[in-house]
Amino acid sequence: MVEGEVISGTVERLLFEAPDSDYLVFRIRRDDGALLTVTGNGVKPLQGDRLEIRGHGTIHKKYGAQFAASSWKRLLPDTAEGIENFLASGAFDGIGPALAKRLVTAFGAETMKIMMNEPERLKEVEGIGPKKLTALTASLQAEKDVNELALLLETHYISGRYAKRLLAEYGDEAAYVLEHEPYRMIRDIDGIGFNTADRIALAFGTDPTGTERLSAGIEYVLQEMTSNGHVCLPDDELVEKAANVLKAEPVHIRDVLNETLITGHLVAEDCSGLTYIYTVDAYERELRVADDIRNLAAKTSLKTHVNINEFIDRWQTEREFTLADKQREAVERSLDSGLTVITGGPGTGKTTVVKAIIALAEQEGLNILLCAPTGRAAKRLAETTQRKAKTIHRLLGPAGYVGEHPLFDHNRDNPLEGDLIIVDEVSMLDLELTDCLLEALPGHCRCILVGDADQLASVGAGAVLHDIIRSETVPVVRLETIFRQQEGGLIVTNAHRINHGGMPVVDKEGEFCFIETNDEDKGAHLVADLYEKEVMSTGGDIFSVQVLSPMYRNACGVDALNQLIQKQVNGADDAKAELKNGNILFRTGDKVMQKQNDYEKGVFNGDMGTVFALGNDSMHVRYPEQDIRYKGNDLGEISLAYAITVHKSQGSEYDTVIIVLVNSHSIMLQRNLLYTAVTRAKKKVILVGTKAALQRAVRATDKSKRYTLLAQRLKRDEIC
């Protein structure tokens, strides 16, 4: 059994539940009557559950004596009163308080023994017929299966908390998978990654140097690199990282990697003297994107009915406005190729160019599609052009998943209906979404990509905009002249100063100010005060003001700031309902954000809304286009959004942006992050933090290289 002390007691209260793991803190009353706080990872117990807990006693500096649990399992009660309470708690499907009372009245302290070993006797109790008995027997058997599998896990020093998930996925084969195919769990079961599967595999006797383990470790390292933005990885770097993770000899890793390549589970590509390793999915996506881009770029100039130069002259005259040379070039070239890139910083006239291109395309009678990666970016595109615009996801039509990858209604077999598509905020496009978008374009459709190449790269894998520009195989128009100097003039000026490595010019009371503080706790409270003040100045519009922080942790991180700001602008009130999910307390009126794409609900990563109703285990959120109900595990998709990370803000604009720059976030402070944060603001930027952090953010350039061969594939000749 699991080593350490064994205690038992009854759960009195759940004190804490982590939002992103199964870490719990709860209080039990030991069998000797003493109260004790238990900490550990496991299946959440119910109030009133009797538990047997393995672990050891600890002393917490703040909270005193605690019991650090390595595992726990539910004990069946052995008194009539305990059994009735246990059954009435909902432990078994189909048994409520009334039936629990009848069962205990019939069988007394023997109730649990009879239920587990002689379930056919339950027919003696009023209200239990053949159908009810069948359902109860199935529920009882499921409980026995969980307990037996949990015991099997614990005999190998693994917490029994995984038992329910394993049985739900594998049924009778769960024990076989544990002993013979443990790494299947990585792809089959949410919440079990390589590290957990590896610990279980080794406990059940997997050879540490065996092919199955090393192969799983190699794939894990590749997937981890994908989450850091890489599409592929040089083989030497992959071998080195895998050897460190697996504590194995590099020569053994290399042998297994070669075997994996031979079987086709991974793909190798030689380029410029290096060998790059891909997952099959990433390799095929990069090939498709390269082919689609080349095919688009190869389209010949559209034969227009309108003289473009005359059209531009007329368009300018009607608006009493003259395009700059590069702006005019962008409009002139917009229909020359099947694919055109228009890039430039804030205030360089990208929106004006897009308006002119739309007017030209409409004059030609073209069917135009407008889209952007996020809801707020699409909304802004619609507002500035006075045309319909959608997120890329909504344009394509979500149709579920294959594994972790999205499916869409529109694809190569069912293309979109359009002659010209304009995609804004393209710096946010990762390889996967680019692939889905390009394959949904009809053969005659032309594409214009608009974005700022100096902003943060996409959260997902790839560097699509950079790679297209770097390939020099697609027409690119760079807008460099700054026009927008009246509204947001200092913001635009400072954005360009920052982008070129210069310190921003600050105006203490104006549109770009810097409030210096070296105390991060005081700084956090200052940010909360500033947020409240700025929101009040707008008449209470919580969506016009946004706090941006580079990281989630520490006093000035997103998590702590959200709690502070919520307390200040939407504090506890008898008139407001509350719901706690994990470590996050929600109230009606809270500003919240969707954290991941949910194709079934039709809400996507970064969408913001307001909580307008809360239940015991449910939340209703009002988004600009719809109301969505969240329940149970779905609540984990939602977070408070008074403060968000800079990455989450991409594609959005706010009247006022409050940016936190503190020393504890130094690892994240880079020029493109600050540049992206500043360019989110339309009217006002408030920097809060230290001069040292500001200087670091301005001077530090992002030296990390994303491994991708898209640019080389577009050039063709550099792939060996």
Spell out what each predicted region is.
Residues 48-50, 589, 606:
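Loop/turn positions that initiate beta-strands
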Residues 405-419, 430, 438-445, 649:
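Short basic/glycine-enriched coil/helix segment immediately N-terminal to the Walker B
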Residues 453-601:
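Conserved helicase motor core of P-loop NTPases
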Residues 500, 607-720:
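C-terminal accessory regions
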